[in-house]
């Protein structure tokens, strides 16, 4: 598709879709809680729909009623063996978390994904789940999908130190631990997003978080809840950056989730000189509205414990850095290389093809700015965040056209992205 270029100031108010991480977990925990769970504000992107379909195939009744998702949970004993392969589409979250959940079930399943997911390593969940007594395997020593899993009703608790910073691996182990008899401990390298821990507690589960150590004694039963999903900060990040780098812009991003394990991008842009104001902050619910205006920015260093708190926002932060004065250095982000694409290389290649000055490193990027961006032929390579980054970059282009292939990938997390973009350009 041909992207909009040479945009004037962006003006208006936007409500971004529901948080993807919370939406997945609401469905997963609701499916094994006892009773009727209702979810408002659920993200209806393709990844979450993959999770919903998986649980329907596992015998859980899930319906939409009055703009809410209603899940008839039957407890951990209520799942039934699927009659077919579970297709997780493009969703690594679905595959890893559901594998953890099914670890304690007395049946076997085969889990597959699309071409992109089939290139993402699952060894990170295979090894701890095997230690708990699950028969699970993928392709080659990296354990690529498809995954074959035989659950075990007599799971063993483990103490596991994560070799990488991954909320998905942590979550897979905790979901298995809810069904294991005894004390499971997970020790993180760096603190990652904690939605699973918070939502297990919201559903009546018990665990202890002590710094980087999470302790859970199983088995436990969960109780149905009413969940309201906040706006996704990872989706809001695209408008946040657009407002900061397009001259004359002023945007209000409504009801954005600001869980502290996800707000690294806000800290980074403020350090770079961004003018942002928080309105209607609800600290208990961890939700706020964010007013953003065009700002003159300077380069910065992004590394260490900050990386897990903004890992999904790094592509759009890289674009931001191309418009900042000076050098921005991103380090310790090698996890980007095993996302939907090798995001370090793909971001570097796309933005450099548009005139940016970026050097890819083993674990990040060195970005020199500011640079003028020009038209180019690009692709999402099947990665939703790459597609949205490119669409925001195109708004800065004054010379040439920007063509984007495989734009349908954006449906993964933000089905109304282009509709919202057009509205902000016309408000």
Swiss-Prot record:
Its EC number is 2.5.1.19. GO terms for molecular function: 3-phosphoshikimate 1-carboxyvinyltransferase activity. GO terms for biological process: amino acid biosynthetic process; aromatic amino acid family biosynthetic process; chorismate biosynthetic process. It comes from the Bacteria. Keywords: Amino-acid biosynthesis, Aromatic amino acid biosynthesis, Cytoplasm, Transferase. It catalyses: 3-phosphoshikimate + phosphoenolpyruvate = 5-O-(1-carboxyvinyl)-3-phosphoshikimate + phosphate. Pathway: Metabolic intermediate biosynthesis; chorismate biosynthesis; chorismate from D-erythrose 4-phosphate and phosphoenolpyruvate: step 6/7. One of its GO terms (cellular component) is cytoplasm. The keyword Protease does not apply. The active site is at 312 (proton acceptor). The keyword Transferase applies. Phosphoenolpyruvate binds at residues 20, 92, 120, 168, 343, 385. 3-phosphoshikimate binds at residues 20-21, 25, 166, 168, 312, 339. NCBIfam families: aroA (TIGR01356). Belongs to the EPSP synthase family. Catalyzes the transfer of the enolpyruvyl moiety of phosphoenolpyruvate (PEP) to the 5-hydroxyl of shikimate-3-phosphate (S3P) to produce enolpyruvyl shikimate-3-phosphate and inorganic phosphate. This is 3-phosphoshikimate 1-carboxyvinyltransferase. It comes from Streptococcus pyogenes serotype M28 (strain MGAS6180).
């Amino acid at each position: 598709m041909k992207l909009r270029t040479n945009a004037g100031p962006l003006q208006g108010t936007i409500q971004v879709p529901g948080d993807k991480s919370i939406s997945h977990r609401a469905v997963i925990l609701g499916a094994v809680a006892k009773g009727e769970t209702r979810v408002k504000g659920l993200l209806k992107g393709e990844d979450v729909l993959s999770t919903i379909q998986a649980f329907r195939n596992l015998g859980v009744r899930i319906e939409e009623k009055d703009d809410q998702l209603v899940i008839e949970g039957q407890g951990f004993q209520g799942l039934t063996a699927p009659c077919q392969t579970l297709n997780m589409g493009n969703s690594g979250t679905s595959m890893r978390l559901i594998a953890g959940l099914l670890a304690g079930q007395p049946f076997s399943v085969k889990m597959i994904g699309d071409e992109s997911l089939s290139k993402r390593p699952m060894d990170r969940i295979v090894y701890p789940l095997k230690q708990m007594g699950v028969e699970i395997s993928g392709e080659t020593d990296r354990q690529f999908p498809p995954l074959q899993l035989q659950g075990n009703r007599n799971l063993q608790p483990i103490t596991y130190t994560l070799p990488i910073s991954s909320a998905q691996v942590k979550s897979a182990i905790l979901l298995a631990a809810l069904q294991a008899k005894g004390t499971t401990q997970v020790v993180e390298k760096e603190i990652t997003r904690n939605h699973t821990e918070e939502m297990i507690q919201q559903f009546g589960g018990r665990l202890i978080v002590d710094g980087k150590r999470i302790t859970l004694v199983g088995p436990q039963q969960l109780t149905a809840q009413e969940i309201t999903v906040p706006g996704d900060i990872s989706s809001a990040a695209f408008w946040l950056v657009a407002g900061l780098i397009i001259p004359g812009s002023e945007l209000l991003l409504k009801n954005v989730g600001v869980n502290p394990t996800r707000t690294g991008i806000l800290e980074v842009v403020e350090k770079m000189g961004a003018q942002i104001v928080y309105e209607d902050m609800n600290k208990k619910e961890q939700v706020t509205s964010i007013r953003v205006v065009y700002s003159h920015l300077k380069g910065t260093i992004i590394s260490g414990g900050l990386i897990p708190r903004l890992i999904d926002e790094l592509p759009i932060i890289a674009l931001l850095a191309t418009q900042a004065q000076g050098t921005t250095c991103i380090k310790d982000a090698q996890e980007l290389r095993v996302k939907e694409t090798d995001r370090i290389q793909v971001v570097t290649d796309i933005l450099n093809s548009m005139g940016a000055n970026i050097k890819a490193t083993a674990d990040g990027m060195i970005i020199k700015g500011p640079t003028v961006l020009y038209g180019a032929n690009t692709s999402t390579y099947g990665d939703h965040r790459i597609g949205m980054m490119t669409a925001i970059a195109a708004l800065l282009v004054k010379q040439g056209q920007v063509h984007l292939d495989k734009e349908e990938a954006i449906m993964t997390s933000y089905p109304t992205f282009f509709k919202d973009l057009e509205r902000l350009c016309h408000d």
